[in-house]
Design a protein with these regions (language model features):
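Sec-dependent signal peptide recognition
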Residues: 1-4
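Noncatalytic, solvent-exposed loop/strand surfaces
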Residues: 12-138
Length: 138
């Protein structure tokens, strides 16, 4: 499964450095001028292929971060990836661990998917560092 995620311009958006936002309350002080998206759809600034998983994006210091599953040397792996928030270009990738599904994987939360969900955690940003866990919380 491949999904496409879209981010707003970091010039207009404040940082969203962790899951549920800065204060973990799922809110922002920003105002959206156009709320009638049926009449005037927002312009997609960029998209990125993010194979499998449940990870959300975070936004910090002009970059967007998430975790994905990706084969590295033929081995399914969990990878933290950084995108330029303005252009969507990949800045870097960091291999976190082998993507393990031998303990049930996502089957615990989604019936019949055979553990094929990929990463389940969202990175966090603090003090110029990115913190990312694997789906095993390692």
């Amino acid at each position: 499964m491949i999904s496409t995620l879209v981010f707003c311009s970091s010039v207009l958006a404040e940082d969203w450095p962790q899951y549920h936002g800065t204060n973990s309350n799922r809110t922002t002080q920003e105002k959206i001028a156009n709320t009638d998206w049926k009449q005037k759809k927002p312009k997609q600034l960029w998209g990125a292929k993010t194979p499998t998983g449940f990870s959300s994006m975070i936004l910090a210091n002009g970059a967007a971060y998430t975790t994905i599953s990706e084969e590295i040397d033929g081995i399914p792996s969990e990878v933290c990836v950084s995108f330029d928030a303005e252009t969507g270009e990949t800045r870097w990738k960091a291999n976190l661990d082998i993507w393990r599904v031998d303990h049930g994987g996502g089957n615990a939360g989604a019936p019949n998917n055979k553990g094929g969900d990929g990463p389940r955690t969202t990175p966090s940003y603090s003090d110029d560092r990115i913190y990312a866990y694997t789906s095993d919380m390692l």
